[in-house]
């Protein structure tokens, strides 16, 4: 399995629109055969900080997700919502490396 942990700092006033776009994308994403989890959380301490958690069966399924139309739409809708001065983080964890062999 592949786990993605993503922290995004949003421009003030953009978090709600980002979450709405994410939820639209999620409707199709969770139907992808390789998707195990696709969730978003908002910080209770700073409403401009979002945490995205994705779990995929393997690297190949994650790569397929990257080419989907619904993800491309989400990316286009949200491309200017991130705070350019905000600190974000991206982490990819291989939970069971043997499962990622093609």
Q: Where do the language-model regions lie?
A:
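Short, flexible segments with low predicted structural confidence
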Residues: 1-2, 16-17, 33-35
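Short, well-ordered beta-strand segments in beta-rich or mixed alpha/beta enzyme
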Residues: 2-8, 39-66
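Short, surface-exposed ligand-recognition loops at beta-strand->loop->(often short) alpha-helix junctions
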Residues: 9-18
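Intrinsically disordered, low-complexity segments enriched in polar/charged residues with Gly/Pro
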Residues: 15-16, 26-29, 40-42
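An amphipathic, aromatic/His-enriched active-site/gating alpha helix that lines ligand/cofactor pockets
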Residues: 24-37, 55-90
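Glycine-rich beta-strand-turn "strand-cap" elements at beta-sheet edges
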Residues: 39-48, 76-102
């Amino acid at each position: 399995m592949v786990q993605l942990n993503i922290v995004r700092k949003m421009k003030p006033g953009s978090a709600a629109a980002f979450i709405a776009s994410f939820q639209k994308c999620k409707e199709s994403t969770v139907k992808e055969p390789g998707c195990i989890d696709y969730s978003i959380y908002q910080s209770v301490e700073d409403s401009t900080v979002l945490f995205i958690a994705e779990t995929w069966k393997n690297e190949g399924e994650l790569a397929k997700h990257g080419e989907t139309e619904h993800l491309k739409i989400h990316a286009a809708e949200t491309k200017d919502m991130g705070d350019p001065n905000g600190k974000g983080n991206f982490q990819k964890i291989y939970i069971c490396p043997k499962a990622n062999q093609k």
